Amino acid sequence: MNNYYNTKTEIAYLFGVSEGTVRNWIKRTINKELNLDLADIDGDLKIIKNTHNDSLINKLIKNGRKYRQLDLKEERKVSSKLEKLLSYNQTLTLINSIEVNKEVPLKFAYLGEGADIWNKFYLSTKKGDVYSSNNSDVFLLDKQYPIIIEHFAPNQKINVVDLGSGNGYPVTEILKKLKSENKLNSYVAIDISQKILDITKKNIEKVNLGVPIHTFIADFESQSLQDILYSIKHNEQDQNIPNLILMLGSTLPNIEPQIQPLLNIKAGMTVEDYLITSNAYDKPETRTSFPAFEFEDGKELILQIPKLLGLNNENCKTEKIYNQKKGLKEFNLVLQKDLQITFPKLNKTIKLYINDRINVWKYRRDTFELINKKCKDAELVQHFTVRNPHMNQIMYMVGIV
């Protein structure tokens, strides 16, 4: 691997500037106005990849924006719909994420009518195998059912806890099987979206399980589940009922870094509890495919919050890439002009600049090595890891001992 940036285009992409700006940096270095480290490669000056250069470039960008006049700026106020949709803390999280990470968190897309869009998206993908994670979850849970049950006492009842419940469909079959064997104590759905929980509860009630159904609003990406999971385990008779926690539908791969939600879940687990999660398996030939975007509902869901922010095809172009450096797929909005976005209720304005990349979706596929590392970092023990032989999906179950 070269220790220098191959092209000006590469630098422009990584740092969100124009190629002309990169040429100007090199020219100023030649004139001894800057002290970038350069390498002469066959007569072509290249910017070397090192911490000194990266630090200086970031400083140049920051200073340039500080004093820059936004002559071509576009001013937008966020939709009143967005201000009603998000809580005060969620709005602060959104602002911080855009300013610091240049990212619109996908989790907010499931709030409000986003829940209905998600439900439509799921139902449309269920008809085929283009977007196969949900179908694979049902298959793998059924295949691994005997192994899952072996981890619980023969006559032990179980709480099924559905994290990021979606519409509840992927867990329906395992709920039926547990009920038929008199092993199901209760079903619990946890999600950031009340509307998602309403859809889930309605669908699970149709199954007629005859057990309590509970719902909790929680953002397990940033919030410890200790209190919620403890309250589920100890019912009114103060029985210690183990939790089987399911986080399906490739929920975890949309979150970065993944260690924090794992720790938030682990905080509420005891030795009797287990977590099962799933993902697509990473192969080089799949890194340029974006199956979710083959469905209009999928694109609508992902772009819902950006549109309420004023990010649209008039001021942005879209970009689907595999980020080799980060090892994940990205869907970005690339600013075509300077933009100021105002949040009237908070009297807060954020500034975005031409060529800024705003990430609105990311996805990290798994490998056995990545799973091993996640479990090691979170101090979780793997009890099984299995791949779907028909679909490119993987599922694993972990515990705290």
Where are these regions (language model features)?
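Rossmann-like AdoMet
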Residues: 65-161, 168-216, 224, 234-235, ...
